[in-house]
Amino acid sequence: MGHKGDLKKALDILDTELKKKGISRREAFKLAGLGSASFLMGNTTEAEAATVASASEAKGKILIVGGGLAGISTAARLSNSLSTPDITIIEPNLESVSYQPGQTLVAGGVWDKSDIVYQTKDFIPSGVKMIKDKAKEFDPENNKVITEGGEVISYDYLIVATGLVLDFGMIKGLEGVGTSASANSEISKKIGKNGVHSIYYADGAVNTWTGMQELIKEAKTGKNLKALYTHPNTPIKCGGAPKKIMYLTDARLREAGVRDNVELSFYPNGGTMFGVPEYHDAIVKQFEARDMKWEYKNNLVEIDVNTKKAIFEKRWLEKGVYDEDIEDYEMIPMSKKVERDYDFIHVTPPMRAPDAVKNSSLAWQKGSASKGGWVEVDKETLQHTRYKNVFALGDVAGVPMGKTGGSVRKQYKVLVENLISLMEGKELTSKYAGYTVCPLITGIGTVMLAEFNWTRKPTPSFPLDPSVERYIWWLLKVYALKPMTIYGLLSGKA
């Protein structure tokens, strides 16, 4: 059908759903403050057309490591912005542009895997060279990248967009390291069976839906069951996803009439539901209304898949002796292992940069970001702080927050503008303000659209209370955001 056909189909479905509510698409967009559907179409605005018409004459060999959403979108925008682009992408996965935000919908039985998996070759911009290989070593001192196949690739400018890896092996009892686009055989030995699930890769999302149906079936026998949901002690992509799948489980259990038979419990490593107070407060109220339980400061460290027991490291502070210097009591960090039974557990794995990045001089050398091996870039310009011809964006970039597709939509414009400025010998003036968006699915038919930046304040794009669950955001999530991403962002226009 093609991308435009996919978009038309999505908008037709959107119209049908809106008609059930007695409103038109135009009225819905007006309500949401969108004005028109042009933002979905990926249409080139007059300003963008002018930019393309006056494309930069700057020259240089650009190497992009990573052919996912961030890498290909950046390649497309650079191709549109340079008169004679010389761009190469290194990417080993033939399905690297899978629509990751849809994995929660697959896990909730709303979509199928076929709705989120795409062929990378269909999105490579014209004129861009694609190398099907994996970066093994970065040599920024000599402007080279060495692949696993032994090829040495030189560059004038490097963009690191490798994404991150899912390190299930950091949890005792689980095995393997994978990506959102693919999971190795080690991971599948333990995940996706015996009640242990994870939506963070495509097949895992499929198996989660199967596991959820099995949970419902068992609950219908009258048994009292326990479902656990985790959030690790590392930065993760889409911080709302561990809660989204919990909300969807709640919705499906209610739909089946067996919600009272299953206790749903969330065990995050952190001490809040969300880093933005307004969204934290809203989520707490939603949890209370749904009788979903939670306990902070719990990090999953081990699973026994045979006995269905999860072991958490629980942390807290205890008051010690009085310190006369600070005129307060000393607070002593405490911890202990806590074992919890489960019938169903959703595991959000620890995440980190790929080994090639983590073990290179591109990674942060000190501070909290060094633990995960994230690329050391200026959080505003996305330029490497030590290697000025290197940039990074997306999940692998060592910036606060920013591990969502919505972040990439802001980041890649900043990166392209700054890279071209560098190529032209100009000052880097474009700044990324930390924008992140999380369409937090709270049920079948409701979404809270959480937008924010480094101020940790809501930054809504629309004139509506962002802490309220709305049907219009469900329509946006289910029918509109995918075509905007696939047709708009991946073409460098959204």
Which residues fall in each region the model found?
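C-terminal auxiliary extensions adjacent to catalytic cores
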Residues: L449-A494
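FAD-binding core/adjacent interface of flavoenzyme oxidoreductases
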Residues: K21-A37, G42-K59, I131-K244, L248, ...
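N-terminal secretory signal peptides
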Residues: M1-S24
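C-terminal segment of N-terminal export signals and the immediately downstream linker at the start
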Residues: N43-S83, T88
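FAD-site-proximal beta/loop scaffold in flavoenzymes
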Residues: E175-T221, V338, Y342-S407
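A Rossmann-like FAD-binding core segment of flavoenzymes
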Residues: T84, P125-E137, D250-K371
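A conserved FAD-binding loop/helix module that cradles the flavin
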Residues: V396-K426, S430
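N-terminal Rossmann-like dinucleotide/flavin-binding domain of flavoprotein oxidoreductases
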Residues: L82-Y155, P277-K293
